Design a protein with these regions (language model features):
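N-terminal leader/linker segments that initiate helical-solenoid repeat arrays
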Residues: 1-74, 92, 125, 370-374, ...
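TPR-repeat structural position
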Residues: 13, 47, 54, 87, ...
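Canonical positions in the second alpha-helix
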Residues: 23, 63-64, 96-97, 128-131, ...
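Generic helix N-cap/helix-start motif at coil->alpha-helix transitions
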Residues: 31, 67-74, 100-108, 134-142, ...
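Residue-level recognition of tetratricopeptide repeat
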Residues: 39, 79, 113, 145-146, ...
Length: 394
């Protein structure tokens, strides 16, 4: 699959984009063509990772929504904003679409997604209950996400397995691909590494150029097989056809693991140069905040980013970063106060639990730190070898 060079879907979509752009030039009054152009750009973003396609899709959808009061077009722009981490803007559009009432269930699915991303758990749960009546694929994948957010990974996997059965019965490649990659992720989080690998391979059988699945395999090769050189090779091959700044962060981690400080600095600088592109907006806030905190000890810059992220997205994950930055600043009691109010019992992500353990340790609460340490040892694969060393030191 690494040798897969023919980007057939990408080539076809570029031709499709060119066709509709030319049609619009010939007939500027035919604004429905904007939807076709936006769809082609969105697919090209998915295939290439190039942010310009996502931003081009946004412009077409904004123009389209000025011409219509169609709920489907509102949802399309809301979906684009979700990809850009513009969750507040997405919510505003979805509320309009809900008032419109057209294909209401499609809007309600997205309202669940956005409320969950914004940390509005009560509202998210309300929409999940509305969707429950269908018990279909779209409900099951959301019930899975909800269970995972609540720390119940076994139930999350069970919901996804049921969703996969529906996808297999429908023979819908898009649903199958979504099921395979997400099950691969969850099996990995559950330390079922062989199953995780098998499902990434199933994804590649359907789509040999799927960068997400290849990145998942690169992580297995690094974190489970302890082969950073091969993992680095996989990442280098992926980036020939798919561009995303976060590949550089993983390569920097691999370089650190291989004791190559010079190469690590180079990858981090390449990442920072990439995310300076204004088109990325708020998409990499959490990555950037952690980088400035942990690699550059630049608490002021990190704190400014974290405060922006909390304003955009007041989730437990955002407040976890605030607590972590506060600890790094030496205000150990304040860090504990923030964590107890906004993080404890609200997220079960291993990285947040690691931060919490360090906060407990700094506040002379060894029993609580030890309980989390025991839990974190189970998450060593998901967190990676470098973090596994830090966990042992708690």
């Amino acid at each position: 699959y690494l040798a897969a060079k023919h980007q057939i879907k990408e080539i076809q979509e570029r031709e499709n984009l060119s066709f509709w752009e030319n049609k619009l030039l010939e007939h500027p009054d035919q604004y429905p063509y904007l939807a076709k152009i936006a769809s082609a750009n969105t697919k090209l973003f998915s295939y290439t990772g190039e942010i310009r396609y996502l931003k081009s899709a946004e412009l077409s959808l904004i123009a389209l929504n000025k011409k219509t009061i169609n709920a489907g077009h509102l949802r399309a722009l809301a979906r684009n904003y979700i990809s850009q981490h513009k969750f507040q803007e997405s919510l505003t559009l979805l509320i309009k679409a809900e008032e419109n009432g057209e294909n209401l269930i499609a809007t309600q699915k997205m309202l669940f997604d956005v409320h969950l991303e914004l940390g509005n758990d009560t509202k998210a749960e309300k929409y999940l209950k509305v969707l429950e009546q269908s018990n279909g694929f779209d409900y099951l994948i959301r019930a899975s996400k909800w269970s995972d957010e609540r720390g119940n990974l076994d139930r999350a996997i069970s919901y996804l397995q049921r969703a996969l059965a529906i996808a297999e019965a429908s023979k819908n490649d898009e649903l199958l691909l979504w099921s395979y990659t997400n099950l691969a992720d969850f099996y990995g989080h559950n330390n079922q590494i062989k199953k995780s690998y098998e499902f990434y391979l199933k994804s590649l059988e359907l789509d040999p150029n799927n960068a997400y699945a290849k990145k998942g395999i690169a992580w297995i090769v690094y974190s489970y097989e302890n082969n950073p050189e091969e993992s680095m090779r996989i990442l280098s091959v992926i980036q020939k056809n798919h561009q995303s700044p976060d590949y550089k962060l993983l390569q920097a981690e691999l370089a650190e693991y291989m004791d190559d400080e010079k190469q690590k600095k180079k990858y981090l600088q390449t990442y920072l140069s990439a995310v300076e592109n204004e088109m990325y907006g708020e998409m990499y806030n959490q990555y950037n905040a952690k980088l400035f905190l942990e690699e550059y000890s630049n608490e002021d810059t990190a704190l400014a980013i974290i405060k922006r992220e909390i304003a955009n997205r007041p989730t437990a994950a955002s407040y976890d970063l605030l607590a972590w930055a506060t600890l790094k600043n030496g205000a150990v009691r304040d860090a504990l106060t923030i964590a107890e109010k906004h993080v404890v019992g609200k997220t079960y992500e291993p990285e947040a639990l690691y931060h919490l353990a360090e906060i407990y340790k700094a506040n002379d609460m060894p029993e609580k730190a030890k309980r989390l340490k025991d839990e974190l040892v189970e998450s060593s694969y998901e967190l990676g070898p470098l973090m596994a060393v830090k966990i042992k030191q708690i």
